[in-house]
């Protein structure tokens, strides 16, 4: 279920029964391979786990790396000249990018998901900041600098933001 929360009210957006882009955060937090479970259900109709086996194990945050101009937010297309994803403890990258691949306008701008996990939110943010500093994507523009700005902003660090926060950040 997707919703927005503003001024004490919840606003329903949609309910999706398909796998969501954010599933990686759920996988990290609960240490469950959701895709594997979906395939298993499709194959034999049964989950390999039950509800009382599902326990929160950590904190996780996902950054979506988009091929876009960080100022105008218009799509960026071209050839990826250099691609070097970050790594290290608590870092996961889901991407099909590679040096030499072509990014066209015939797709969603999401080119990678950078997921951190850690014992708490602060550790996740620290790991994401380091990973974004290490991330190298040359040949197309990305929103990496915007994500670094967000992760360093005091409002974000204090978890004091709402649905119009990003607009205020850039005004």
Predicted features and spans:
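ATP-dependent carboxylate activation and anion-phosphoryl transfer catalytic cores
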Residues: 1-171
């Amino acid at each position: 279920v997707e919703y927005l929360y503003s001024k004490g009210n919840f606003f329903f957006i949609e309910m999706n029964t398909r796998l969501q882009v954010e599933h990686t955060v759920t996988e990290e937090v609960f240490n469950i391979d959701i895709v594997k479970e979906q395939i298993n259900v499709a194959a034999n109709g049964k989950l390999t786990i039950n509800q009382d086996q599902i326990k929160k194990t950590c904190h996780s945050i996902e950054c979506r790396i988009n091929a876009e101009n960080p100022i105008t937010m218009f799509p960026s297309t071209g050839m990826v000249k250099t691609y070097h994803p970050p790594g290290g403890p608590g870092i996961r990258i889901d991407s099909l990018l590679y040096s030499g691949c072509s990014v066209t306008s015939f797709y969603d701008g999401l080119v990678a998901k950078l997921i951190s996990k850690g014992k708490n939110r602060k550790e996740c943010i620290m790991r994401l900041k380091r990973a974004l500093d290490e991330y190298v994507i040359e040949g197309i523009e990305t929103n990496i600098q915007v994500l670094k700005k967000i992760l360093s902003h005091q409002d974000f660090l204090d978890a004091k933001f709402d649905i119009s926060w990003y607009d205020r950040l850039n005004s």
